């Protein structure tokens, strides 16, 4: 005869076991730059991913995700090793990466392991031309190009000097913007540089003496921006604005380089500090602030969106029984929802055709959205320079 106490214990154990079946934990690999040249952007993305996991695990109930993070040190070979190590640890998918030259080989490695690779850090057009069925990204070069071109149209730019890194995504963007500007009758000077260069005074001096443009556009990365703006601050070319793209109009850059950032313009979906209107946005901002004791910026928002879409697809695939049969990619392709970066859906190549960006300007320690005018949170300072 089983005592009442033992019966209660057995029932509780059975219920716990049943709950365990339903509340399965899925391990997701995070391959991201936490050190090296891309560390500022990588850290912002990583914080957004962690925030997504916190919110998902708190609100989903039925399923949980566990993050395993490996620092790729901003190095393509180490990114490949990170993906291979994560695959050996049984992750169900990979999220992360920053820089197309890193994401390319890393996502190739994920494809060989039949793992979904989700990113917001690689916009090179060739990434979605490889025929990979497991590659997904929420942003792309056309979204950045449109933002830059809209800004130039709005301020009436007549001439531009484009300083661009010879890396894939930066070259793509520079040449596409050149083509579009020349079609509008804008005079364009092109200045390519090797990613190893740290002294930008020769190229800035050439622009100052020969091009004499309205605007300098930088298609580059964090450390490049710093070098170019520093050289321009010394040589003081007679331009009206210094404009860049990703990872420039961020709170982190303002904090780290307060003397270089005033009036500099870069892509930014969010003003800083930001005030969200939607319940999802408010929960994201509140959770992020509790975790990291600071205000969100757009890099963290990108990290959050890509991770949350992945986690939601994992949960759906687990529910319909397709996750363990390689069905996660198909489930991700069913995504179509409004997110903190706008509507996201994925085409056959894993690209988000709805992606569009805005331009933000550093003003008095804040980032103000200045373009497109219809979505501006404040007026643009133009002409406006850091010197």
Description of each model-found segment:
Residues 232-304, 318, 373-378, 382-387:
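Extracellular/periplasmic periplasmic-binding protein-like sensory domains
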Residues 17-23:
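Sec/Tat signal peptide C-region and signal peptidase I cleavage site
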